[in-house]
Swiss-Prot record:
PROSITE patterns: AP_NUCLEASE_F1_1, AP_NUCLEASE_F1_2, AP_NUCLEASE_F1_3, AP_NUCLEASE_F1_4. A motif (Nuclear export signal (NES)) lies at residues 64-80. Its cofactor is Mg(2+); Mn(2+). The active site is at residues 171, 210. GO terms for molecular function: 3'-5' exonuclease activity; chromatin DNA binding; class II DNA-(apurinic or apyrimidinic site) endonuclease activity; damaged DNA binding; DNA binding; DNA-(abasic site) binding; DNA-(apurinic or apyrimidinic site) endonuclease activity; double-stranded DNA 3'-5' DNA exonuclease activity. Residues 289-318 are annotated as: Mitochondrial targeting sequence (MTS). This is DNA repair nuclease/redox regulator APEX1. Belongs to the DNA repair enzymes AP/ExoA family.
Amino acid sequence: MPKRGKKGAVVEDAEEPKTEPEAKKSKAGAKKNEKEAVGEGAVLYEDPPDQKTSPSGKSATLKICSWNVDGLRAWIKKKGLDWVKEEAPDILCLQETKCSENKLPVELQELSGLSHQYWSAPSDKEGYSGVGLLSRQCPLKVSYGIGEEEHDQEGRVIVAEYDAFVLVTAYVPNAGRGLVRLEYRQRWDEAFRKFLKGLASRKPLVLCGDLNVAHEEIDLRNPKGNKKNAGFTPQERQGFGELLQAVPLTDSFRHLYPNTAYAYTFWTYMMNARSKNVGWRLDYFLLSQSVLPALCDSKIRSKALGSDHCPITLYLAL
């Protein structure tokens, strides 16, 4: 339910899972709670140097970036485009754009190299959800949604087919505060899995975006305290595992860095979570098995600011 502020203004709950602070009983109790949440001190993630060659020694030929921008217009005001220009991806995928296509900021025209731009947003909800895909090369084909009316009303999926692979960028529905959309999320997961399996049967698949789940305990800072919260319920984690097995797909980051902890892509704005690195890994590049020989690196750009998520980058040698 929306919450009301002091003057009666409606404040919408955010879509991302949040770790709520516990009530303070005393100064000593507050310090204890903080230590339990973040440990004795913040442990930050250091992104290692980019690996730009595949296991066979082939140089990377494709760079894809994905970023949940938490509002396209606000992200641009926070200099998000400056990071994009410096990173210089061949393909840029954006989630939670919260912007209809007829209201896109003019600043996007500055991305002259990413001239092929595709957008999807809800037809009846301005300022909600939405995804974008910007590409240097013109895709062979572009489509929107997963082909089921129940799941294609909120602008959550763009599919772009290229010569060597199909790219899907997605903003997966959040189960919501109090898990009010968990049942819907489970229906989505089943339909999305079926859709991706069909795509992957015809051409190698790259799936990227905010998939709104921390798969394993290593993928969030406070697993014990979030097992009943959106993004880490047993149902969502099981659905993600079934996606990996059924399509099948491989988590590119965990494939390369199986034991790397404190690597997160989302931090709530509350309680200085980002500076303390109390986060979640919700953003992924998932790859078909046949793409793995081309995998050079899968990066988490945790120092890039502009949203409550950070961008992620994939290098492929195709």
